[in-house]
Design a protein with these regions (language model features):
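Short, surface-exposed, charged/polar-biased interaction segments
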Residues: 51-55, 120, 176
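Generic intrinsically disordered, low-complexity segments enriched for polar/acidic and small residues
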Residues: 1-2, 16, 96, 117
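Generic detection of long, well-ordered alpha-helical segments
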Residues: 21-28, 88-96, 171
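Conserved acetyl-CoA-binding loop-helix of GNAT-fold acetyltransferases
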Residues: 166-178
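Short secondary-structure boundary micro-motifs
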Residues: 7-8, 16-17, 114-117, 174
Length: 179
């Protein structure tokens, strides 16, 4: 493991303020340690460093062998009109269309920069796979994920077009991806 810091800003003259990201590079055989200690990979620095960069960030770790579904959760997973496909690569137009609708519906944009906020940027060096969720044979949502080994899966962006909010696809996707 190699640790390094990106000192973004700070003011030490009158204040003791330092804003710095703690980053790391791990060897493949150190990934388990990284995940178990709150590190997650990101690709922001990849072009500069040429390696997968990890950040120590708040995240959720589940031991899937211990996840048990309630009757209500099992019922949610029996929705007959929802189908899921796994893709090894992404269709930019498909994901972009879903993402744009998601950003608009949820108001996840910065005022004055709406058009920029709605762009699904994929200058990403993590080789994501995709759960594509279909409602009545129409793609309506996706989740990106990366499998590291038989114990560690990283979940990335989720987006849903919200054309039918009563579908509860956020809940459905969360449950589906845990099974």
């Amino acid at each position: 493991m190699k640790l390094f810091f990106d000192h973004i800003t700070g003011k030490l003259t009158n204040y003791d303020l330092i804003y710095s990201l703690a980053l790391a590079e791990f060897e493949d055989n150190e990934y388990e340690y990284a995940f178990e200690n709150g590190w997650i990979p990101l690709s922001w620095y990849y072009t500069k460093l040429k390696n997968l960069t990890w950040i120590n960030a708040r995240n959720t770790r589940l031991v899937l062998d211990k996840v048990e579904f309630s009757k209500k959760q099992k019922y949610v997973l029996r929705k007959k009109d929802i189908k899921v496909k796994i893709l090894n690569s992404f269709d930019y137009d498909l994901l972009s269309t879903i993402y744009k609708k998601y950003i608009k519906y949820r108001n996840f944009y910065e005022e004055g920069f709406e058009n920029d906020s709605e762009v699904f940027e994929k200058k990403d060096y993590i080789d994501w796979k995709y759960f594509i969720y279909y409602y009545k044979d129409t793609p309506v949502a996706f989740t990106e994920f990366k499998v590291f080994d038989n114990k560690h899966v990283l979940s990335g962006q989720f987006a849903w077009d919200y054309e039918n909010p009563k579908l509860g696809l956020g809940t459905y996707a969360t449950l589906y991806e845990k099974q």
